[in-house]
Amino acid sequence: MAELEPGVALDRLCELSRRMLAASDLDARLTVALASLAELFDVRHTMLFVPAGDDGLTTIASHGYPPGGVGASVPFGQGLVGMAAERKRTLTVTNLERGLNMVRAIHASASPARSEGRDIPFVGIVNAQSQLAVPVLIGDELLGVLYAEDTRPGAYGHRHEQVVEIVAHALARDLSSESEATVQHDAAVAAPGGALPLQVQYYQADSSVFFDGEYVIKSLPGSILHRVLHDYVESGRVDFTLKELRLDPELQNHIGRDNLDARLILLRRRLQERFPFVRITRTGRGRFRLELDRTAVLQEA
């Protein structure tokens, strides 16, 4: 791919910045940022990973891939994504054979078949020949990794790398736990219609959630989903705030310095992709609502 001319790159970067600033929230900014990288800079395939505790990093957003990969995980130190996270610096691969080896390493390490089906398959490009992994940092704190790949050799020049780094910098503050809103919101009650009840299984050992026996999600997003479903089953409540989740003693061990808004986006997108009959929708800054097309029966183990 030809290197971007300085003036062209700057004009397009200004347009990307304008689009991101116009986005209403983090979820929208992620979608706009990745779509604009493809449209304006021909960076066609991108993923954003965020830390997931001991599980390494997990995919929160992607562009240019088939649906189904949100929530896939990559261990720290493995593959280009894991190494960029561990070293906290930008890494690139443009060599064909080395690039293929890196891709194989990512696919081998990402969401392996373990934990009795509690993992989501990685959806990256198997024959990628160009890769770019940029850590999202505030100071020395790792907030994520912005990853790009392409089947074309030499797809990313120096200015492509700079543009992806600038987008990573722009997303850093949004992904910081300090950026979350603390707006209160009143509870509400919902009564979905008469399909067969949704059987929800929750396993406390790894905070994993299953719908009708099918794995949904685990770790902090699983704890959040369990919390709101528990409140819904007990009282019919459907409206919640990020502030109350952060203050919930049952979630304290999971949250740490994690950004709840980012984990909520991961949960929302995972539900959209695989379980559209359960939805997490925004109702305001720092507020969200649980929507179900079926009543739920919760089992805990």
Which role fits each region the language model picked out?
Residues 118-121, 129-137:
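A short, aliphatic-rich beta-strand micro-motif
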